[in-house]
């Protein structure tokens, strides 16, 4: 009997499960000690409120993860300020007014879609998973109400595979849906016989395991435009139930899963290193140290006691101010601690603080909390800015990978969805068929460009100082180019800078006005001179009369 499509998908799922097995023990440790609620290795864990933080005594690792997630959110994709802009591959085209305006309008509309959707609720969750487990995943789906709808996946609930380029192009997610949700989403005719029976019996809230498989559609017919022949194939199917029944088969024009990795080794699908993995050993050591400190204090304040046998079955009190009576017999020491504990916790506290600092360094806490931890009031503003820029550069490699594996696909996906929904204005003719370039202008992206800004500012300042003694030094500075370069590196809105052709028109008009004013001034001066000559008295001897007489005398 031929293999059904569902059986083939289940076989692929089993292979991906086997590939992921070696990572799971590490992820479980990270989950137990840093982010207990950030994983889901069993679909049956849905809506389970079991206590999971039993291995955490000191939550320094968990708080460091929170700071990293919040810092990346505010520093990379802050909803409070623009963090990306669209540009053309040809920089000269950016000086063309209609292109500038169109790109600005598109960027503003995309930001409105981001703010309206739940994107900014999902990104911190993905950043937390990325920092602790090294791998994050989030789906970006079309939505009739908010244009897009995002859903972050907990670690352990999905399986990934790479394309030949090394980027993720396959994702199978396992999750749970209630019988009611399945019937509402897929229809009663598409669910399995067992789910249909539960629906008819009224057990609407029973959970059923569902799989969602997204893979490249290698067998598609590119000449057809239906959902089953799109570049990426999407299939929903139950783990159990009928062996030949799929819940839904459709497709995507773009890969809808964002799957950034912190650091990847070779051909690995999942991350090989991240702050959580670096800090895990210290996080475990910190729990032991905190237990030892508590035991030390406990033994000092409530020590084990020794007593003579005469006190056996007698009333003994350890309450403050209470009295225990006993007969002291020669050779007996009475009722006393078994051993004296000197609670000198200074060395232990110093080691605990050192361990905490190591954990915070692994999570870049010192970077995100720099202005809070350092007294910057006594420092020059330039020194504070340079220190901040230097620390932000430490995240440079991670930021580049995040751009490539998460932010670029996110913007491409949302742009395409908005284009299909006719939410974008008609582009200028010069942009027809031209790919756009994405530039990031977030706080961290600006830190990467700050070296160029500083160099440009220093160069312009140097030329200005020279011009005080040698004004012709300004001839060496192209002011228009300096303004354009500075505004581009600063991330200023393109509409703030006047296009070059408009500047040229303004200058030509100003030159014409200056010429007209000069001609008018010369005309007025000539008229005034003629008037003066006409009013001059020639009866008295003067130079003027001499000239006039000489001009009128007959020539010999």
From Swiss-Prot:
Compartments in which it is found: Virion
One of the record's GO cellular component terms: viral capsid
Biased composition range(s): Polar residues: 533-542
Keyword match Ribosomal protein: no
UniProt keyword annotations, A-Z: Capsid protein, Viral capsid assembly, Viral genome ejection through host cell envelope, Viral genome packaging, Viral penetration into host cytoplasm, Viral release from host cell, Viral short tail ejection system, Virion, Virus entry into host cell
Function: Forms the portal vertex of the capsid. This portal plays critical roles in head assembly, genome packaging, neck/tail attachment, and genome ejection. The portal protein multimerizes as a single ring-shaped homododecamer arranged around a central channel.
Name recorded for this polypeptide: Portal protein
């Amino acid at each position: 009997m031929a293999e059904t499509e569902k059986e083939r998908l289940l076989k692929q799922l089993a292979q991906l499960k086997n590939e992921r097995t070696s990572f799971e023990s590490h992820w479980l440790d990270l989950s137990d000690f840093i982010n207990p609620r950030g994983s889901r290795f069993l679909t049956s864990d849905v809506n389970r409120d079991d206590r999971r933080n039993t291995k955490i005594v000191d939550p320094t690792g968990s708080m460091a993860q929170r700071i990293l997630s919040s810092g990346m959110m505010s520093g990379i994709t802050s909803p409070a300020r623009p963090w990306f802009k669209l540009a053309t591959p040809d920089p000269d085209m950016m000086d063309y007014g209609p292109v500038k305006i169109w790109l600005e309008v598109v960027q503003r509309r995309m930001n409105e879609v981001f703010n309206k959707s739940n994107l900014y609720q999902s990104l911190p969750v993905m950043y937390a998973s990325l920092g602790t487990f090294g791998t994050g995943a989030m789906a970006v789906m079309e939505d009739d109400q908010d244009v897009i709808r995002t859903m972050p996946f907990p670690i352990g609930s999905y399986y990934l595979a790479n394309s030949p380029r090394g980027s993720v192009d396959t994702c199978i997610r396992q999750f749970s849906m209630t019988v009611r949700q399945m019937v509402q989403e897929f229809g009663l005719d598409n669910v399995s016989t067992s789910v249909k029976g539960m629906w008819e019996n009224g057990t609407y809230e029973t959970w059923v395991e569902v799989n969602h498989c997204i893979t490249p559609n290698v067998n598609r017919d590119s000449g057809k435009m239906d959902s089953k022949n799109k570049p990426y194939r999407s299939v929903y199917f139950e783990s159990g139930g009928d062996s030949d029944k799929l819940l839904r088969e459709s497709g995507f024009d773009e890969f809808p899963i964002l799957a950034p990795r912190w650091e990847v080794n070779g051909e690995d699908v999942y991350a090989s290193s991240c702050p959580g993995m670096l800090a895990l050993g210290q996080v475990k050591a910190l729990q032991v140290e905190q237990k030892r400190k508590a035991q030390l204090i406990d033994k000092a304040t409530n020590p084990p006691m020794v007593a003579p046998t005469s006190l056996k079955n007698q009333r003994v009190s350890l309450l403050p101010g209470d009295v225990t009576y006993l007969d002291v017999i020669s050779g007996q020491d009475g009722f006393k601690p078994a051993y004296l504990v000197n609670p000198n916790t200074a060395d232990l506290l110093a080691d605990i603080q050192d361990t905490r600092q190591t954990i915070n360094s692994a999570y870049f806490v010192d970077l995100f909390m720099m202005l809070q931890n350092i007294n910057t009031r006594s420092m020059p503003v330039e020194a504070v800015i340079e220190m901040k820029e230097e620390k932000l550069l430490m995240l440079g490699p991670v930021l580049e990978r995040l751009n490539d594996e998460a932010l670029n696909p996110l913007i491409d996906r949302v742009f395409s969805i908005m284009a299909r929904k006719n939410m974008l204005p008609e582009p200028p003719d010069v942009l027809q068929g031209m790919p756009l370039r994405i530039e990031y202008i977030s706080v961290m992206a600006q830190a990467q460009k700050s070296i160029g800004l500083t160099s440009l500012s220093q160069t312009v300042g140097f030329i200005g100082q020279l011009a005080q003694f040698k004004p012709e030094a300004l001839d060496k500075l192209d002011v228009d180019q300096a303004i354009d370069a500075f505004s581009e590196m600063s991330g200023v809105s393109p509409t703030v800078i006047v296009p070059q052709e408009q500047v040229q028109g303004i200058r030509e008009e100003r030159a014409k006005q200056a010429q007209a004013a000069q001609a008018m001034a010369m005309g007025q001066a000539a008229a005034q001179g003629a008037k003066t000559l006409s009013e001059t008295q020639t009866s008295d001897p003067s130079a003027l009369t001499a000239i006039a007489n000489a001009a009128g005398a007959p020539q010999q």
